[in-house]
Regions:
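Glycine/Thr-rich phosphate-binding loops that ligate phosphate moieties of nucleotide
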Residues: 2-41, 45-47, 57, 64-65, ...
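Gly/Ser/Thr-rich active-site cleft segment
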Residues: 19-21, 32, 100, 129-256, ...
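Phosphate/pyrophosphate-binding loops at sites that engage ATP/ADP/AMP, CoA/4′-phosphopantetheine
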Residues: 63-85, 149-153, 196-215, 240-244, ...
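Residue-level preference for well-ordered alpha-helical positions
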Residues: 126, 167-168, 199-203, 237-241, ...
């Protein structure tokens, strides 16, 4: 009997499931956190009545299909079935708004993080709290509904996020992991709970409306990584596994957000570490030693799954424009009768960029495929410009587009690292930009003027990170922190391939962004 089969049959495997934007993915891991099976379900949000949403049917059909595909993978690989698990954890896209009445009925369609319909509320709360409240945060959605006089608000008994909703329906527990909760409402780093001063301010703000609830009564309870968060109910087991093989009573860990699972999957939960996820969009998260001195609209304040404060820079645009140009070069090659392999094409063009001038020789790219809040743009218009005396070469062209993919991120990071003087020992890079060895990594190191590590074992991303958080709950030693557990038992001291910033690259990127 294989070790993995034995792990599954003895109920020692741990399951992580993440509801991402394009897909729901499940990862099953063994006692040492190694993935042994997976399943996925593709889904798409829809725009209905001007709201980006997923229906409840989308959510439950997606979950059961995803779990069913995981069960098929287990059957195919190990010729066995899952009847019990050591632990389960759910994560999802953070923020958004799911409001329920006293009977557990959804009051209005799920409003996802993608909606930019809460500008008035976000601005008012940011001013009231002296704390940046982005439009996608749950509290901004609630306050906007209040400002708009929406009838359902008086009937709210509970509101939560997507991961919180799934967890509630499977366990009966109205809880959230602190990282996920930090995208609903600001967290007090000392108490690892909602900021009571801000809750009091909110209650005072809406008191004239006469609603029958106080804010804390309708928010999920906050838990930190490692705490018990309920067990799978008999009804929950049926919702998850249509085959009926899965038994009730399995412990669940606190549901987390996709930011927290990304931190776990890259082993960047410790103070002075961070990670950058760079693909279609890009975001950077840095775990802080102390609170920032000022409020910055470019920076979101969230937490690690353990409740340490994290500053996040989120940009809508990263590689889309770059990918479009690579597609054009593919057409050029095909016009000459060549059939280029896309991985080879990307690799060749990315490596070519290393031959370019450090400041891109007078070439400048703006990669705004869509609107960009960090730079105040409502719509995207990708642009490429050059000075008449520019050094117009393929190397500089590629380098300028690679710089552009991280330039907006650099604007936010400069506020963090230069204005706020935040110290970072190491950043972990993951995502498509880092596939070509040493290129995207070196450019990020230049943008941040800090060492950047890329793990060989990027693992399975978010759902793997969620499985690790569930594993931590059941496998942690007495007094063992999440940071100690991940570093010692999962990553085993692996720090990945590290690139130090090249001073000439740092200076070149500075010159480029000032243009």
């Amino acid at each position: 009997m294989s070790n993995a089969k034995q792990t599954i049959e003895t109920g020692k495997a741990v399951l992580g499931i993440e509801f991402g934007s394009p897909r729901i993915k499940a990862v099953l891991v063994n006692e040492t956190g190694e993935p042994i099976a997976s399943g996925a379900h593709d889904w798409e949000n829809r725009l209905e009545d001007g709201i980006w949403t997923y229906s409840l049917d989308d959510i439950w059909t997606g979950l059961t299909d995803c779990y069913g595909r995981l069960a098929e993978d287990v059957k195919e690989k190990y010729d066995t079935v899952i009847t019990s698990l050591a632990a389960i954890g759910f994560s999802g896209m953070m923020h958004g708004y799911m409001a329920f009445d006293k009977d557990g009925e959804l009051l209005v369609p799920f409003r996802t993080w993608r909606n930019t319909i809460t500008g008035e509320a976000a601005a008012a709360l940011t001013k009231e709290f002296s704390f940046n409240i982005p439009q996608r945060w749950s509290i901004a959605h609630l306050y906007q509904a209040i400002l708009d006089g929406e009838e359902h608000v008086g009937n709210i008994s509970y509101f939560t996020t997507l991961a919180g909703y799934i967890h509630w329906k499977l366990t009966g527990e109205k809880v959230l992991g602190v990282g996920e909760a930090s995208g609903m409402f600001p967290i007090d780093a000392k108490t690892r709970d909602y900021n009571q001063t801000m809750i009091d301010k909110f209650d005072a703000l809406v008191a004239p409306k006469g609603y029958p609830w106080k804010l804390r009564e309708i928010l999920p309870k906050v838990l930190v990584a490692g705490e018990a968060a309920g067990t799978l109910s008999a009804e929950g087991a049926k919702l998850l596994d249509k085959s009926g093989n899965l038994s009730a009573g399995i412990p669940l860990c606190p549901p987390e957000g996709d930011a927290g699972t990304g931190m776990a999957a890259t082993n960047s939960v410790a103070v002075r570490t961070g990670n950058v996820s760079a693909g279609t969009s890009v975001f950077a998260m840095v775990v802080l030693e102390e609170d920032l001195k000022n409020v910055h609209e470019e920076l979101d304040m969230v937490t690690t799954p353990s409740g340490d404060t994290v500053a996040m820079v989120h940009c809508n645009n990263c590689t889309s424009d770059l990918n479009a140009w690579v597609g054009l070069f593919k057409e050029f090659a095909e016009a000459f009768g060549m059939k280029p392999d896309m991985n080879e094409l990307f690799g060749t063009l990315y490596r070519k960029a290393l031959e370019g001038d450090k400041d891109c020789g007078g070439l400048l790219a703006y990669n705004y495929f869509s609107g960009e809040p960090v730079t105040g743009l409502n719509e995207g218009r990708p642009l490429f410009v050059r000075r008449p005396d520019a050094h117009f070469t393929l190397a500089n062209f590629m380098r300028s587009h690679l710089y552009a993919s991280l330039a907006t991120l650099k604007i936010g990071l400069d506020i963090l690292l230069k204005e706020e003087k935040v110290k970072v020992d190491r950043i972990y890079g993951h995502g498509g930009l880092f596939k070509t060895k040493g290129v995207g990594q070196g450019i990020l190191a230049a943008a941040m003027d800090a060492p950047v590590a890329v793990m060989e074992t990027a693992g399975e991303g978010g759902p793997w990170g969620m499985a690790l958080l569930a594993s931590y709950m059941v496998h942690k030693a007495e007094g063992e922190t999440l940071e100690q557990y991940l570093s010692g038992k999962i990553f085993g001291g692996e720090t990945g391939t590290v690139m130090e910033p090249d001073p000439a690259d740092v200076a070149g990127f500075e010159t480029y962004t000032k243009q």
